[in-house]
Structure formats: C-alpha cells, structure tokens
Amino acid sequence: MASRLLLPFLVVFNPVTAQGLGGLWPVPQPTFNSGSTPVFINQDIKVTYNGASLAHEANLEPAALTSSDITAAGVSRALDNIFNQNFVPWMLVPRYSLSSYEPVANASAAAVSCLEITLTGGNTTFDPTATDVDEAYSLSIGEDGTAKLSSKSTFGILHGLETFSQLFYEHSAGGVWYLVNAPIEIEDAPVYGHRGLMLDTARHFFPVDDIKRTIDGLSYNKLNKLHVHVTDSQSWPLEIPSIPELSAKGAYSQSSVYSPDDIKSIQEYGLARGVEVYFEIDMPGHIGVVGEAFPDLVVAYDARPYFFYCAQPPCGAFRLNDSNVETFLGNLFDDILPRVAPYSKYWGTGGDELNANDSRFDPGLNTNDSAVLQPLLQTFVDNQHTRVRNAGLTPTVWEELVTEWNVTLGSDVVVQSWLGGGAVAEIASKGHKVIDSNYNFWYLDCGRGQWLTFGNEIWAQFTPFNDWCGPTKSWELVYSHDPAEGLNGTEAELVLGGEVAVWSETIDSNNLDSLVWPRAGAAAEVLWSGRTDAGGQNRSQVTAAPRLNAQRQRLVSRGIRASPIQMEWCLQYPNATGCEYPAA
C-alpha cells in the first residue's frame, strides 16, 4: 500500500492552530513543547520495541499478558485509531476554513515512517498486581518525522501510544493523516496513581461489550481503574459455580449473568489497555438479594417502609452474629477470589449505608443499639479482610466503616470516600489511604430526577421530583474538584486518587456512554495532570473546553457515544473566548 495518497494540489498551511487543533487530553505534564511544522504519518509505519522489529497487525489482542505482547496490541490499536477511527477536524476550526489549517498534501513533506519504543525499566516481565507502577513516559516527534517513545513500564508505553494517536488527524482529501505541531517534546506523568470509574452492574445489568467499551474509554483518557460494584440488594449477576443458586435466583434473568469466563475476559481486556478491573461485593448491607436463595442468612429483606431500614428498596443485610453467614462467605470467597487475584490488587468489601434497624429483625440480636452492633461489625469486617488478604488482595471499603462505625482497619485497607464535607481529611487524618469519589462533584448519575413514584395523596410534597444528589454534575463541576483541597501535606500524601461513580438506577446500555463521556474525562485530567497547573493556578475551563471538545470528537470517532459539551458554533469560534461568560 502506498505510504500516502499523492495529491495534485497545494494548500497553504496556517501555522497558527485553531482552538482544539493539536490539543491533547489529558494535557501532558510537566512538559509539552510543540512547534508549528506539519508532519504526516505513513500507513506502512515500522515499529521497533527495544531495538527489535515489532509486528503489529490489525485487531491484535495480546496472546499473553507479557510486556511485548501488550505493547504490540497497543501499537495495533493506536494505529487503528489513527488510520481507521480518526476524524477530519473541520469542527475544530473556523467555519469553511479547514483548508487554511491543513498542511500541504504532497510527496515531499516529512512523515513518521518509524516509531522507536523503548522499555527502560530493565524488567520486561509484566506483573498486573504490582503496586506503585511508574506510568511516566517520554515522547518526541521531530520535524523530520523521527518518533521515539520510552517508559519504565508497559502501562507507561500504553499511555504514550494514546498520546501519539491523539496527535494525528485525517486529511479532508482522504488517505492522508498528519499532525500540525512538530517538533514535539513530551515528558508526561500522572499526579495520582489511582484514576478510575466505578460502575454499578446491579441496578442495571451491563453486557460484557458495554463494559469493554467503557474500558476503551478509560484508556483513551488515561484512567487506569475500573471498579465494578457487581452485586447489590437488587440483583446478583455474578455466577459463583460453587453456589449456583446466587445467580440462578438473584439475577434479573439468566442472560444477565457474568460467567467466570466473562470475568476473566473483562480483566484481561482491561490489563491489555492499562486498566485494572477490580470487583466489589458490598456487605454486610446492600446484600438483600442473597435472601432470594438463602433467606436464613439475611435480615430485613424488602422490609417496609423501606426508609426505616435502608437507603432504597429492597433492603437486606447479613446477620452479624451468625456462623452460617461466615460459612457461606468462606465458600463464596474461596470460589471468586482466586479467580480474580491474578489480574488485580484490590477487592471491595463495601460497608456503606449499614442501617442498625435491620438487626431488629435478627432474632439472635433484636436490637439497633450501635454499642452492641459495633463489636459484631468489627469481627465481621476482620473476618472478610482476612479472607481477602489470604487471596493476595488488598481490601477496599466505603467510608462509613471509619466515619460512622469506628471500625478499626488494617493499614493496608483503602477507604473510598463519597460523602464529601471534610470526610477525606477525617479519613486521612486517621492514617488511612483514600480514594475520593465526592458525590457533590463526581457522581455522574445525579441530577436525573426521581426514579421513585409518588401516590396522589403525597406527590405534591415532592415536586419537582429532584433526586437526592442533584443537580447534574456538569463537566465544569467535575473539572473543578480537587481531591487534595483543604488537606495538609501528610493527609494529601494518603490520597491515592479518585473515581467517578456511575450508579445505575436510571442508566443502562442505551445511555451509558452519553452520561459517562466526556464528563469522566474531565476527572481524568484532574487526576492525571492535576487541578492546578505548573504555576499553581487552577486549570481554566476556557482553555480546557476546546481540548475536551476535540477529545469528545475522538471518542465518537472511536465508537463511544459521547455527549457534546457545547454547540458547534463554540467549537468553530476563532478563539476560546467565544462561549466564555463575560467577567463583568
């Protein structure tokens, strides 16, 4: 195949780029230097890995989770995104002026004909359960088309390949791809090591393809964790071969179940894209659905009126002082934990929104006295965390175990905070590592109105039927959140990063993409690049919007149904101030 289509015309190249043209998401830091020279890329580009030629045929998936195989598959995807899933950036330049921004399309222009990839860490083996992975990378593209990418880790290589792919656009003439801003020098590294999204698969079931597409979106935004809240009181979509009754009676349907092969496939798919997938089975609350198969293990299942016993129907919690519950959980964890442990560091044990009133249904307790229940909860948590550790995994929990129940946790346990209002500082001040998911900023399901219905005798009290956590978390609000705000240095060091949350009461396959993207990308830049720039100033929405508009277009071109954040008029305005609200 020809390297480029030779065109019989010349176009004058405008060295001054338009708003989103040449912008990257998330913005590289600490170094992103670029020029104004256009460079093409050859379709028959050669790629080397540590000096050896690297095969990169189309649609390549890694044969094994090795550094070389993962890199080869990453190259395959990056080139596919450049040559087959790219876009002509007419919407990023002033109306009908694309010809002024595209380079001259002729045979004499410089082109990237080889990409040299170097893994500098010295260890070419790949450990998906490794902690403190160095995800930094270096990328350079010269005016002559010389391209080099290096990193100490495989994940860093994948991030660099994503940046490489974002630099190129499709030419309006077709068959030609180019970047606008060589020479390019990038030194890039994340501010936070934990950058993720939590997906609830219990309120609505998401097919494997939806989850894999979400993983694609995470990788395009340099997010590296997918936290799957896999079960809840509403449904149990997880097949446990040794306890088949759980999904047989607890799933919405037998087509709404993740098999062991599905779980393995999802985790491997994620790791091949730099995304660790880890799972959570919330307990001892949020577990009512177990009562469908094992009613003697659960109290207050679907108790009414529900708001006395849980946050939403159906209620249900494990008995806190029952040997049968411990036997059941031993069998459950013996089945699931060894299967996920080779691919992940974490396992979530939940712990949120436990309602003491549930234990009034327990004939062995018949109390809601927290002084009685707290020691039992402590023992329950200790037992589950021992099982998690014995499988080689690190437990994660929700914040209420610390902030409301005063449970003593091991120093390894990671606490996920969601209630805001100084909770991160409180948790960190007690020495716990923290993942921030402040609902005021990072709950992407909020602002969609009530899913509850109200009878004629009471409906007027609840107009206009707002949900509990509105308003909608716009991309600007997501972008404004700093996980370390208000923390002292010691506390800030304990913040591992954050996760945006996608609770699925009103989200399913049909609106997942549009509600997640590109808003999750706004959090991705905060977590990768930092809320503030090198000068200590908050990153500006005004200068971020053109780049996020361009990123949204990339996502759409790559098969993700991302929502627009502005009208096209804003994108095509000659500078970023066209849709900026006047200061005074």
Q: Where are the model-predicted features located?
A:
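Active-site neighborhood of glycoside hydrolase catalytic domains
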Residues: 295, 307-310, 314-413, 418-428
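Feature activates predominantly on carbohydrate-active enzymes
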Residues: 126, 130-315, 321-348, 499-503
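Flexible, acidic glycine-rich loops studded with aromatic residues
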Residues: 395, 400-403, 407-413, 417-584
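Acidic, contiguous N-terminal accessory segments
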Residues: 14-193, 395-404, 409, 550-553, ...
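Structural recognition of the beta-strand scaffold that forms the well-ordered cores
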Residues: 39-41, 45-49, 196-198, 227-229, ...
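Fungal secretory targeting signals
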Residues: 1-18
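Flexible loop/turn segments at secondary-structure boundaries
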Residues: 55-56, 205-207, 233-237, 284-290, ...
